[in-house]
């Protein structure tokens, strides 16, 4: 005598919401955007969902927590965009946001640190305007982020080359050491642009710390 095939587990929409940690309203929105579909309906018209639906909602939640839009998630799930491409593009956006936040942080530090600095209400409009310009540039120019990554890699190579010179005991006036110094100065000038404060800060650090305590850099 053969055994009856057990019926697969089904979830009503409220049960699915409870099982996945989202609201019923959110599930309705997922359905409206084409991300989720009921596996079947009861005779009374109630939506029913299967185990694949539960897994799909968990996948949507995971991608949402990474910051993806529902439109991007749908493209990835439909296969029109590969997940790795989606992750790379999102990484670029995150790096831009980090760069923007770093610039804003430095600006705020300039305004709030130091006993001689006094921040007045009159300065705030100009400060907010500067922040807005930084935000606009970050949002509209991805090449800025790529350039920053490329410069950071160049900086690491210069640092490693200099440390190798020091470990080998090469003379500071040797050809290799001079080439590293030239590369470092060129990169610093490229990063600083017309901002003379960078070279000023390096000179101050040179007076305050010995070269080796500056991770091998001797301005």
UniProtKB/Swiss-Prot annotation:
Domain annotation HTH merR-type: ranges: 10-79
Gene3D superfamilies the UniProt entry points to: 1.10.1660.10
The keyword Oxidoreductase is assigned to this record: no
SMART domains per the UniProt record, alphabetical: HTH_MERR (SM00422)
Record-linked Pfam families: MerR_1
Entry's Gene Ontology molecular function annotations: DNA binding; DNA-binding transcription factor activity
Keyword DNA-binding in annotation: yes
GO annotation terms (biological process): nitrogen fixation
UniProt keyword list: DNA-binding, Nitrogen fixation, Nodulation
DNA-binding region coordinates: 13-32
PANTHER family cross-referenced by the UniProt entry: HTH-TYPE TRANSCRIPTIONAL ACTIVATOR MTA, REDOX-CYCLING DRUG-SENSING TRANSCRIPTIONAL ACTIVATOR SOXR
Described function: Involved in genotype-specific nodulation of soybeans.
Protein's name in the database: Nodulation protein NolA
Organism: Bradyrhizobium elkanii
């Amino acid at each position: 005598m053969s055994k009856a095939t057990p019926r697969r587990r089904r979830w009503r929409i409220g049960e699915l919401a409870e099982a996945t940690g989202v609201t019923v309203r959110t599930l309705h929105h997922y359905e409206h955007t084409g991300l989720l579909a009921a596996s079947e309906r009861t005779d009374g018209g109630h939506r029913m969902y299967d185990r694949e639906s539960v897994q799909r909602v968990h996948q949507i939640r995971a991608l949402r927590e990474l910051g993806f839009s529902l439109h991007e998630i749908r493209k990835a799930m439909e296969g029109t965009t590969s997940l790795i491409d989606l992750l790379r593009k999102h990484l670029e956006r995150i790096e831009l946001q980090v760069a923007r936040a770093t610039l804003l942080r430095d600006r705020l530090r300039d305004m709030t640190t130091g006993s001689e600095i006094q921040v007045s209400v009159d300065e705030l409009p100009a400060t907010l305007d500067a922040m807005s310009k930084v935000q606009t540039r970050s949002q509209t120019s991805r090449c800025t982020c790529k350039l920053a990554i490329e410069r950071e890699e160049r900086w690491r190579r210069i640092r490693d080359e200099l440390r190798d010179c020091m470990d080998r005991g090469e003379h500071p006036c040797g050809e290799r050491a001079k080439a590293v110094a030239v590369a470092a100065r060129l990169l610093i000038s490229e990063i600083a642009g017309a901002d003379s404060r960078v070279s000023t800060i390096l000179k101050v650090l040179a007076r305050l710390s010995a070269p080796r305590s500056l991770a091998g850099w001797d301005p």
